[in-house]
Amino acid sequence: MLRLNGLRVLLRTLAAIGALLTTASASAACADLLALSLPSTTISSATDVPAGAFTAPDGTVLDALPAFCRVVGVSRPASDSEIGFEVWIPSAGWNQNYLQVGTVVFAGNIQYRSLGFALRRGYATATTDGGHRASIGDASFARGHPQKILDWGYQALATTISNGKALVSAYTHRAPHYSYFFGASNGGRDALIAAQRFPGAFDGIIADAPSSAWVHNAFSWLWSQDAQFGSPAATISAAKLPAIQAAALAQCDAKDHTADGVVNDPRRCRFDPRVLLCSGAESDACLTAPQLQTLAAILAGPVNPRTGERIYYGFEPFAVATPGTWNQWITGNAAVPGGGHAVLANQFFANMVFDTGSAGFDHTQVNFDTDVARAERKPVAGQPLASVIDATSADLSGFRARNGKMILYIGWEDPVVPPRGAITYYESVVARQWLDNPQISRAEDALAQTQQFFRLFMVPGMGHFTGGPGTSAFGALYGPPALAIDRQHDVLAAMEAWVEQGIAPERIVAAKYANDDPAKGVVRTRPLCHYPQSAVWIGQGSAEDAQNFICVDSPRGAYLDAAPARAPLPSSAQSR
């Protein structure tokens, strides 16, 4: 018995020594990364971070992180390049995989929250600042610096893919088994760029609310800015948003057989805002004729005033009163008086298109006829601007050939990226299958071929990558946590199952928490169905429970009826 106890003590001692040696070895390995030679790259620091809370350089506090090796570096593939990046590698418990995360808006910083998300899931992870040190709402880095536009467009993504994987392999002494990418908003654009330009880099890609058609999307922002602020008489105050939302829901909410404050498929009901016209004195419950024209223009989206041709899409009216949607992006609020659309549009056009800088830019001088082509073709390092920053290529043949899988999702009430654009992009990929596969003879077959590697989820009631009255808790980068980390509830787990087990995601059960706070309980659950399916209540059982919904096929296309040939013009656009 004494011998047995002694043996146990010896084994425990050896295990403790082994753990210490392992930790010391990992520390040495992390520090050794400083000497790693990478093309056009300098490693600034490589340090071990203990488990627990971590305060990032920007002040972000990330709780409950595992111990990790934090690598900070900068790449300079060209003389005017300054691409910052970070790579975080678990010191123990690595899941053997790599997850790169995307940027936000104009980038300019490291998204530490996204790195923490990936690290907690066991991944080695990396991201970039997009090639500059401004801020997410500042595009001044681009003026007079075509190389920096190129870096922000796709070069920063490319160098971080290369450096991230090299550093992970050097630290762990093995290549990642599977590689994934997850990005939201501009990071969603990064995700599509990865599939289109670098098809061999990732096994699985998740694109959340991607601003894929960036140039045309910018015209949507400018259009709503012109409509909203073109004249004081036409401006819609935030106080009127509840009346607009109520009128839109009154017309359309019950069309999906559940009057629950969420419109499952806005394509099935075209809201007629004329019901809001004031019949007497103006109040917050109605709109004047100029305000009605403003609303109609924002909903319809930008058009060429000469030809009536659609430039891009507008925004949906069914959650406009939800905080963080229209009051932040379109009507403006105390923090952003002119609205986020004005900020993004002015920064983009002033610094990437016209090179005036913000102080010298007059948004009323942008011509919705001639300046669309001017913006698309603006020379950037020998390429048209649109080809550098847009992620609209329908050719995913390389990504498909390497057996890659991709999920794109977007909220139907997104106030930043028009959600119908996601359908148009997806349908362009479906159409491309006809070109890549001559044996396809039916539209249904082209769709089925696309669904083998690429699926689109339209999320009812969700705003820009989170928020809104819809069920937005399904494991998004910036959303509330999923009910469970499994393929039935969590989008990343669903992607892992698709890539690693061949189980394609048919539906994902999303949740809505009270005030989007998991501690306050679940308000409802709802299945997210992959396009062209949508969730339909079976007619019995609680309409707040996902088990009482089925996914059924719906018609395809951004519009189910004929889109208006000529959308109403903002008064400011009419005079140009």
From Swiss-Prot:
Q: What Gene Ontology molecular function terms does this protein carry?
A: carboxylic ester hydrolase activity; metal ion binding
**What's its EC?**
3.1.1.-
* Top-level lineage group: Bacteria
Please state what the protein is called: Uncharacterized esterase XCC2094
The record's family statement is:
Belongs to the tannase family.
Enzyme class at the top of the EC tree: hydrolase
The lineage, from the top, is:
Bacteria, Pseudomonadati, Pseudomonadota, Gammaproteobacteria, Lysobacterales
Q: Where does Ca(2+) bind?
A: D253, D256, D260, V262
Which cysteines share a disulfide bond? C252-C269, C278-C286, C529-C551
Q: Which UniProt keywords apply?
A: Calcium, Disulfide bond, Hydrolase, Metal-binding, Serine esterase, Signal
PANTHER family (UniProt xref):
FERULOYL ESTERASE B-RELATED
Signal sequence range? 1-28
- Indicate the residues that form the catalytic site: S185, D414, H464
Read off the Gene3D superfamilies from this record: alpha/beta hydrolase
